[in-house]
Amino acid sequence: MGAVDEVVFLLEEAFSGEGIRETNEAQSFLTNLRSVDTSFWRALPAGGQRTIESITLHVGGAKVMYDDYAFGAGTLQWTDITVRPWPRGFAPMDEAIAWLKTVHGALLDHVRDLDDAALSEPRKANWGAERPTRWLLSMLMQHDTYHAGEVNHVRSLLDRDDFWRWG
């Protein structure tokens, strides 16, 4: 297995890895999103500003932006409908998740087209700087995992079960 295959595996794990089935522990974005009741999709926890809907749209939009700048024309803006297909409060949960899977798949297609040496090549980031390809992809992995935790926390606050089960 080459380096690109490893990167694809890690991107997939951060996005949709199942984690530990026996204890229902998962750190991936999509797996945490699947645990969300539809009544929580647009709900705000006390004192919160981010809904699970808005987090999901942000994660998908970041994938579109990184993909466009690293592998495409590098012209999209955060306000473009391709990046943000619904305004806040109007994204149907099932459609937003389907869109998220689609944009993740498009990114993976570009990564799979790379050879191992290309992981060291500089590519443009969506803020204009150039970074090694592997660095940009690492940011996307971390981004998925970070926001998976955020989804889990918002869901647990809304469900009133925000406590540690093991320690």
Locate predicted features.
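Short, contiguous alpha-helical
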Residues: 1-33, 38-84, 124-167
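Acidic/histidine-rich alpha-helical segments that form the ligand environment
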Residues: 85-124, 132-143
